[in-house]
Regions:
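Loop-centered beta-sheet repeat module
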Residues: 1-45
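Acidic/His metal-coordination segments adjacent to aromatic residues that form catalytic metal sites
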Residues: 18-30, 81-89, 147-148
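A short glycine-/small-residue-rich loop at the edge of a beta-strand within enzyme catalytic domains
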Residues: 31, 35, 57-64, 89-97, ...
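Oxyanion-binding "anion nests"
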Residues: 39-87
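A structural signal for long alpha-helical coiled-coils and helix-turn connectors
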Residues: 5, 48-52, 74, 110, ...
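Long, well-ordered core segments of solenoidal/helical folds
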Residues: 1-17, 63-81, 122-139
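CBM-like carbohydrate-recognition segments
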Residues: 83-84, 89-171
Length: 171
């Protein structure tokens, strides 16, 4: 996990890129794609959860990274509970999978003692945002659309994260 975090970290924003050119260490688009950042959050929480308790130093490092990133991410949450496709670019469209994933991470983080209960209201606002994007037939709209993830639409990944969000057990 540390290797991924170190390679994808964007110093200017404190967020993470989703593509890195290993040949020269550059980031082709340099964007903090919100779903990618949400994957980092859910990965940190889940990895912390499954590491043996005897790995104290590693668990503490994951916890610190998780809490720090969650703090940065929540600054980008919009008033309606959602997030932009590029997390730190308000000119991009509002994306639906991101709040589902971050809500999962908050619910799991609170359950596991990594986050305080005061964050539940923000997670609940994310969940409410996501629910407003669900059509009567169950499809979730305005996710980064499969397979290119370059415009709003639907994706099976988003559908799965919405189910996990509703279970409130973490991703």
């Amino acid at each position: 996990m540390k290797g991924i975090l170190d390679r994808l970290y964007l110093k200017k924003s404190g967020l993470y890129a989703h593509i890195r050119d290993e040949a020269d260490g550059s980031f082709p688009d340099g964007n903090a794609w919100s779903v990618g950042v949400a994957w980092i959050l859910t990965g940190l929480e889940r990895t912390w959860r499954v590491l043996p308790e005897k790995m104290v130093r590693e668990r503490e490092d994951l916890k610190e990274r998780f809490v720090s990133l969650m703090d940065r991410v929540l600054r980008y949450q919009c008033g309606d509970g959602g997030f932009h496709d590029v997390m730190d670019d308000p000119e991009t469209y509002m994306e639906t999978e991101t709040p589902a994933m971050i809500a999962c991470a908050v619910y799991a983080g609170v359950r596991d003692g990594l986050l305080g209960e005061e964050l539940l209201a923000q997670a609940d606002a994310m969940a409410a945002y996501v629910r407003r994007k669900i059509l009567p037939d169950g499809r979730v709209m305005d996710a980064a659309s499969s397979p290119a993830f370059d415009r709003p639409g639907t994706s099976v990944e988003c559908q799965a994260h919405v189910l996990m969000m509703e279970k409130r057990s973490g991703c």
